[in-house]
């Protein structure tokens, strides 16, 4: 639904502008703020209702790496409660062959929980060594799994010898690609800090957001009422995803953010010049 790609200059620029506008340094933001954490599983802290926001019930609109319906579903199903949970969920969002038909089913069947699931390549290495597997062998197994090359029979026997459960071994075999934990930590850090500003400094947040995207933002079309914005959103979402243009994607992304802004009681957008 909403995507900004990778962690880049835009995200760093917006954080710098928010620091300047609010006087709050990003590195002073605590990662255990419960209200900010709640944005990753619900929308209550923003004091708006999901039905007003076209059914979006998570407070992550406008944050980087919160991109597709799949990501929304993963956050909704896992309901992260801590910063470390957010890191793990991002690993599930970005990896290939890790969520659908794999960890999602294991969690549903109570074979594992978020904290014990494979989410990043680091999880495999640490778990194998904790179970007593030689570090060199554990690293070789991890490298093979994270590249989607699976587990050899010799490695599988080694894992069973160290009491690695069957569900874990089968999960490893389904993985096509895994990201490193450090990658997800950096993204989670940016998401959390932006979530803090979004929650506690809404005017400054939306000002910074749209000043960064002024070249892609159609003020004339989007500075309208809530009902008109909903019509725009629903109209674009009726178009099959593969048939949507880049302009459609930008319009949809920005329409959601403007609608959310209006629902939070802000009626105008102030841009910041470069």
Predicted regions and their residues:
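Noncatalytic, beta-rich nucleic-acid-contacting surfaces in large DNA/RNA-processing enzymes
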Residues: 1-274
């Amino acid at each position: 639904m909403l995507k900004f790609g990778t962690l880049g200059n835009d995200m760093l620029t917006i954080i710098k502008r928010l620091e300047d506008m609010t006087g709050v340094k990003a590195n002073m933001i605590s990662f255990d703020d419960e209200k900010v954490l709640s944005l990753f599983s619900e929308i209550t802290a923003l004091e708006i209702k999901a039905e007003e926001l076209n059914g979006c019930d998570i407070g992550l609109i406008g944050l980087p790496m919160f991109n597709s319906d799949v990501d929304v579903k993963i956050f909704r199903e896992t309901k992260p409660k801590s910063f470390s949970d957010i890191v793990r969920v991002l690993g599930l969002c970005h990896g290939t062959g890790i969520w659908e038909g794999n960890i999602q089913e294991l969690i549903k069947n109570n074979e594992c929980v978020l904290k014990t699931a494979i989410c990043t390549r680091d999880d495999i290495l640490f778990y194998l060594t904790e179970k007593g597997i030689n570090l060199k062998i554990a690293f070789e197994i991890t490298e093979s799994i994270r590249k989607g090359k699976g587990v050899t029979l010799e490695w599988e026997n080694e894992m069973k010898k160290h009491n690695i459960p069957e569900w874990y071994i089968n999960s490893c075999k389904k993985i096509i690609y895994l990201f490193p934990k450090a990658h997800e930590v950096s993204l989670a850090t940016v998401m959390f800090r932006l979530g803090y500003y979004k929650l506690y400094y809404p005017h400054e947040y939306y000002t910074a957001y749209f000043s960064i995207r002024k070249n892609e933002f159609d003020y004339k079309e989007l500075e309208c009422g809530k009902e008109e914005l909903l019509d725009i959103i629903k109209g674009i979402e009726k178009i099959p995803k593969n048939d949507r243009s880049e302009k459609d994607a930008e319009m949809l992304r920005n329409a959601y953010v403007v609608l959310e802004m209006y629902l939070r009681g802000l009626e105008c957008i102030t841009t910041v010049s470069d």
